[in-house]
């Protein structure tokens, strides 16, 4: 929920494993940079499997007691971590019974952005750090979603962000946020248009390449006046978008891509490029809905 003064928080899904704090650290740092409150969310759905033959399932009341006992401890530890890292950030918590992806989707309605991890943990846990959370959340959330990889991503200097451009309204929204993120960190920005020549060889490749450059230039035009402090590099790169963006992410602070989002089935709406970079990027990935 928004704070009393109307500021929408940075929401982060809290992993039950205290050794996995990269998403929480990223969210706390982002809240501090933006002057926003931080909301820590932990959720678990009641287990539906994993019981031995003849073993009775717990009642909802029993499961609720377990959830609150463990969940309160998980959130207390997460709050201590966040407050020690960014003491001036206002922190709130939420403990919920339900599937993490859908709990976070509800939280996203009043958030500036939502942050989750992407490590692959045991499937016997309900967790925020799995593709089963990241993919449906990025497909349905009405706000930007940040997926932070485990283990920690190490960047090289000079620092830069990467944004994928394809001329669509989705990539235009991604460019806007990418400029913001770069400006907040004093980083440069690389805007990339991935170009694949026609497999049939029937197109004028020089004309097609010129068109790609035109679209890229028009997409980034005007943003430099809003963020003149951001050093911008833009280029058209030959290759599949997922491969181009994944390669560019290797030493980046973050990768920003647009997504259709907020609709039906995950695989149909998230898009192959967004899904591909979520699986393969080396750095935090920010998906931006329109």
Task: Identify the role of each PLM range.
Residues 2-60, 159-205, 224-227, 231, ...:
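Small/aliphatic-rich secondary-structure junction motif
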Residues 59-73, 207-211:
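A short acidic, glycine-rich active-site loop
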Residues 1-5, 19, 61-65, 80-114, ...:
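Structural beta-alpha unit
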Residues 134-153:
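Short, structured interface segments
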Residues 115-118, 145-151, 287-289:
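Short beta-strand elements of ligand-binding domains
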Residues 188-257, 265-278, 284:
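Structured core of small recognition/catalytic domains
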Residues 113-136, 158, 254-280:
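Glycine-rich, Arg-bearing micro-motifs that act as flexible, cationic patches
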Residues 39-41, 92-96, 146, 190-192, ...:
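General small-molecule cofactor/ligand-binding pocket signal
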């Amino acid at each position: 929920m928004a704070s009393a003064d109307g500021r929408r928080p940075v929401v982060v899904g809290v992993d039950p494993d205290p050794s996995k704090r990269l998403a929480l650290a990223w969210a706390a740092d982002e809240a501090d940079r933006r002057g926003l409150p931080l909301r820590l969310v932990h959720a678990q759905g009641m287990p539906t499997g994993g019981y031995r033959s003849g073993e009775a399932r717990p009642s909802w009341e029993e499961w609720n007691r377990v959830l609150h006992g463990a969940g309160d401890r998980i959130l207390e530890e997460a709050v201590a971590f966040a407050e020690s890292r960014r003491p001036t950030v206002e922190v709130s918590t939420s403990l919920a019974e339900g599937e993490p992806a859908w709990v976070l989707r509800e939280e996203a309605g009043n958030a500036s952005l939502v942050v989750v991890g992407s490590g692959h943990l045991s499937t016997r846990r309900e967790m925020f750090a799995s593709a089963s959370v990241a993919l449906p959340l990025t497909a349905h959330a009405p706000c930007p979603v940040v997926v932070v990889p485990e283990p920690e991503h190490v960047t090289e200097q000079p620092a830069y962000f990467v944004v994928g451009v394809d001329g669509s309204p989705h990539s235009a929204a991604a460019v806007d946020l990418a400029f913001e993120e770069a400006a907040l960190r004093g980083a440069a920005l690389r805007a990339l248009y991935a170009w694949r020549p026609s497999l049939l060889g029937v197109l004028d490749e020089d004309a097609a390449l010129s068109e790609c450059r035109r679209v890229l230039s028009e997409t980034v035009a005007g943003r430099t006046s809003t963020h003149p402090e951001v050093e911008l590099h833009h280029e058209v790169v030959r290759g599949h978008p997922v491969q181009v963006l994944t390669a560019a992410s290797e030493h980046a602070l973050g990768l920003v891509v647009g997504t259709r989002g907020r609709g039906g089935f995950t695989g149909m709406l998230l898009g192959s490029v967004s899904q591909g970079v979520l699986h393969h990027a080396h750095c935090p990935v920010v998906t931006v809905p329109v």
